[in-house]
């Protein structure tokens, strides 16, 4: 029996390093630092990829794109997300919606909200109304509060598409 509806949850964290922008949801956002990572460090797309993989128990982003593999050095996370979503589609499932939260003190993300949502929708070929991106702070608590990095979480609902 095919389970008709599946939920997945993912998260990702990256520390700040020298740089002049962060890439979130495929969008380059000016900032006083970059994100330390093997790929482009896009915590939004990494969390979303993990949520999609988790929904169908397909492992995690580290298993599919190990940071020890040189072919993923500096990889564009939009390409990785597209590959992950194709795994979902190949199994007969499709995204109902994604709900993503980004936690950081800086940069402020409100003015990039629609652009980030549209970027994700474009990669997945879904309507922008299926994608939610919210930004919050941790009230100066923890590593994000000390402006040492960024955290993102994602929850997805996927459903089996009868043929």
From Swiss-Prot:
EC number: 4.6.1.12
Chain residues that bind 4-CDP-2-C-methyl-D-erythritol 2-phosphate: 12-14, 38-39, 60-62, 65-69, 136-139, 143, 146
Keyword annotations: Isoprene biosynthesis, Lyase, Metal-binding
SUPFAM superfamilies in alphabetical order: IpsF-like
One Pfam family, short name: YgbB
Residues at which a divalent metal cation binds: 12, 14, 46
Site feature: Transition state stabilizer: 38, 137
UniProt pathway annotation: Isoprenoid biosynthesis; isopentenyl diphosphate biosynthesis via DXP pathway; isopentenyl diphosphate from 1-deoxy-D-xylulose 5-phosphate: step 4/6
Note accompanying the cofactor annotation: Binds 1 divalent metal cation per subunit.
Domain of life where this protein originates: Bacteria
CC cofactor: a divalent metal cation
Alphabetical list of InterPro entries matching this protein: MECDP_synthase, MECDP_synthase_CS, MECDP_synthase_sf
GO molecular function ontology, one term from the record: 2-C-methyl-D-erythritol 2,4-cyclodiphosphate synthase activity
Catalyzed reaction equations: 4-CDP-2-C-methyl-D-erythritol 2-phosphate = 2-C-methyl-D-erythritol 2,4-cyclic diphosphate + CMP
GO annotation (BP), single: isopentenyl diphosphate biosynthetic process, methylerythritol 4-phosphate pathway
Function per UniProt: Involved in the biosynthesis of isopentenyl diphosphate (IPP) and dimethylallyl diphosphate (DMAPP), two major building blocks of isoprenoid compounds. Catalyzes the conversion of 4-diphosphocytidyl-2-C-methyl-D-erythritol 2-phosphate (CDP-ME2P) to 2-C-methyl-D-erythritol 2,4-cyclodiphosphate (ME-CPP) with a corresponding release of cytidine 5-monophosphate (CMP).
PANTHER family, sorted: 2-C-METHYL-D-ERYTHRITOL 2,4-CYCLODIPHOSPHATE SYNTHASE, CHLOROPLASTIC (PTHR43181:SF1)
HAMAP family reported in the protein's UniProt record: IspF (MF_00107)
Quaternary state and interactors: Homotrimer.
Name under which the protein is recorded: 2-C-methyl-D-erythritol 2,4-cyclodiphosphate synthase
Organism in which the protein naturally occurs: Acinetobacter baylyi (strain ATCC 33305 / BD413 / ADP1)
Record gene name: ispF
